[in-house]
Regions:
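Carbohydrate-interacting/catalytic domains
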Residues: 1-16, 20-54, 68-151, 156-163, ...
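Short catalytic-loop micro-motif centered on adjacent basic/acidic residues
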Residues: 57-60
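Conserved Walker B
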Residues: 63
Length: 638
């Protein structure tokens, strides 16, 4: 029976797999969507859903894995029509533009996630966090270190997990070379040069027209630095000029190597500030300045107003609220240095770099009340095993070191049960109130900013989750629905301001610290209110957000840098969103002081509190009860 089959079973590590895989997953074979017949067969269900008018849009996962993303997306656009939403999970580099010729409304929003997270990072902590990382892991994980590690890990992935794909590519290069270039290049030299070229590519895929010079620039640089590779590079270039299989496979392999080497490996090794190690992230760049943030939002409003923006997805390595907690480490970086050193002394780890990476994630999901239940313990231990396998230093998915993995889970258990537990409790309580403020403000900016915001399941409440399967846990929608009904009732009856004032006074009387002592108690309701009001406003006035202008809003005064604001509108300004940056440092300086913000002409009402303002107002008055505000001009009907 076996002899009569048109295939032969092979060991995957021999590097002779003859079918295209989804990255390195042997059980997922790539389908040739470039074949019109296959496209028709695989899109029958989608065509039926479109015919029955059951869906409003389509999200395309990993288009960089396709042979021809342009043609595929054009066909898909023809299938679903011009009026339906079409977004692509295209992971962009920091300076990489989305090709405007693609038949999509934009990306799925990981580029926006980097911006929305980065604006809340306290950049003053960079040196301190770098030195701590150097002490704990042997690397500062700054931009240069990240770049070096990225190149090394991409080479490793190309030589191991994706060796079969590299060998298929080199064979295609030989076939597509119709010149005499590189005729004397050995297979070994060609393969080594291909690996180095793939590792040097700074983007997932460089055959988009907007990146047309990327490959030639890298090739020219390699010729200059490695003269001995000239013949091999001539051979590769000649093959690419044929516009055949080699060029296509090179583009596909680059994306797979980038994903496996960076997202799935490097981002589980680097440990300076793990909140920045997200899909589409740039952890070597320590945060985003206000100037960069505003310019990027304006660009999105002009070029991609219908792109998705996101903070949490099924693929993010941490939920938005977990990342907010970790981001707040930067506001208490000196305390964190002390905590990390104490934990290292009290609870020796099987590996210091692993421990430093895991400690930040532990802080991210540690219960603020210190109630580390068995469920929390299980979640953290499961995450730790997944993280060390992804990192691939001491164990991996293919070569499990059960002794090391047991040592890591025992270390997590010792954190929970041992003397370090109370220290983590204290630190988490200190940064949590800042994290909630970041969560609320960042959500507000996402909802009011350019693009179409996506709210992942359950994220309208504060949710402290890690990577899958942790972010696929049960969501209590009944509780959320009941809370939303209560909010609507309070809003309709005009009780919101009074209820917030009462909650603040009660929390102050109980001795809770901070500018918003009541925020921890009402965190879920506050975040849900932000989501509800933002989405409601977008639904009532889609033109303001889908085609409206974007303007930055700036404060004036000693605490001006702590305010990040934006205004949206059509033929004028209609909506203003304000959020608090670096809230704990603001608290340290005693609050907003005499800092002011000047509103456009007319009366502006905060949808969250019901308070109204005009002209130049003190920020402390606008953000009296909540660290974020959604101001709507009186001429806007709501």
């Amino acid at each position: 029976m076996y002899e009569r089959q048109n295939y032969r079973l092979m060991f995957w590590r021999d590097g002779v797999i003859s079918y295209r895989r989804f990255f390195s997953v042997n059980g997922l074979a790539g389908i040739r969507q470039e074949d019109p017949l296959i496209f028709e067969h695989t899109h029958r269900t989608l065509r039926q859903l479109i015919a029955e008018d059951l869906i409003d849009g389509v999200r395309v996962d990993h288009p960089d894995g396709l042979a021809d993303p342009f043609t595929y997306l054009n066909r898909l656009r023809d299938l679903i029509g011009e009026d339906r939403w079409l977004v692509a999970e295209k992971i962009l580099g920091v300076t990489e533009p989305l090709d405007p010729r693609l038949a999509v409304d934009g990306t799925t929003g990981y580029d926006a996630l980097r911006e929305l997270d980065g604006i809340f990072v306290s950049r003053e902590a960079e040196d301190s966090m770098s030195m701590l990382s150097l002490q704990q892991s042997g690397s500062t994980w700054d931009e240069a270190a990240i770049a070096a590690a990225e190149h090394t890990l991409k080479r490793d992935v190309a030589q191991s997990e994706l060796a079969a794909e590299i060998r298929r590519l080199t064979r295609a290069i030989r076939r597509d070379n119709f010149s005499t270039a590189g005729a004397d290049v050995s297979d070994e030299d060609l393969e080594r040069t291909v690996i180095d070229l793939v590792a040097a590519m700074p983007v997932y895929r460089a055959d988009y027209i907007s990146l047309s010079r990327q490959t030639s620039t890298i090739v020219a640089d390699m010729v200059r630095r490695f003269p001995s590779r000239r013949a091999a590079l001539d051979l590769i270039s000649a093959a690419f000029l044929a516009n055949g299989e080699a060029k296509t496979r090179f583009a596909q392999v680059c994306g797979a190597v980038m994903a496996k080497g960076v997202e799935d490996t490097l981002f589980y090794r680097a440990c300076r500030l793990v909140a920045l190690q997200e899909v589409g992230g740039a952890p070597g760049r320590f945060g985003v300045s206000a100037a960069e943030f505003h310019l990027l939002q304006q660009e999105r409003a002009m070029l991609w107003p219908h792109a998705m923006t996101t903070l949490t997805t099924h693929d993010t390595k941490r939920s938005e609220d977990t990342r907010a907690r970790i981001i707040e480490i930067t506001e208490r970086h000196k305390d964190f240095v002390e905590l990390a050193q104490q934990v290292s002394a009290l609870v020796p780890a099987p590996d210091d770099a692993t421990a430093h990476f895991l400690l930040q994630n532990v802080i991210g999901v540690w219960p603020v009340d210190g109630g580390t239940t068995d469920a929390v313990r299980d979640r953290l231990q499961d995450y730790a095993v997944k993280a060390v396998r992804e990192a691939g230093v001491h164990t991996s998915w293919f070569d499990n070191d059960t002794h090391f993995e047991k040592a890591v889970t025992d270390w997590v258990d010792a954190l929970i049960e041992g003397p370090a537990s109370s220290m983590i409790d204290d630190f988490v309580r200190e940064i949590h109130r800042g994290a909630v403020q970041v969560s609320l403000g960042r959500k507000m900016l996402q909802l009011i900013g350019p693009g179409i915001p996506d709210t992942y399941q359950g994220q309208e409440f504060v949710d402290l989750s890690l990577v899958d399967p942790d972010n696929r846990r049960f969501v209590d929608y009944v509780n959320r629905a009941q809370a939303l009904d209560q909010f609507k009732e309070s809003a309709l009856s005009g009780r919101i301001h009074g209820e917030l004032l009462q909650a603040r006074d009660a929390a102050t009387a109980e001795g809770h610290p901070g500018l918003y002592p009541h925020l921890e108690e009402i965190a879920d309701r506050a975040k849900q209110a932000v989501v509800h009001e933002g989405v409601y406003l977008r639904r009532q006035h889609p033109d303001v957000f889908l085609s409206g202008d974007y303007q930055a809003v700036f404060a004036v005064g000693e605490a001006a840098s702590h305010l990040i604001g934006m205004a949206r509108g059509v033929s004028g300004l209609d909506v203003i969103a304000l959020a608090t940056r670096r809230p704990l440092l603001l608290e340290d300086r005693g609050g907003w002081g005499e800092t002011t913000v000047t509103l456009p002409e007319g009366r502006w009402t905060d949808r969250l509190t019901g308070k109204a303002f005009e002209g130049t107002v003190a920020v402390r008055e606008v953000l009296d009860l909540l660290p974020t505000a959604l101001l709507v001009a009186d001429h806007v009907e709501v």
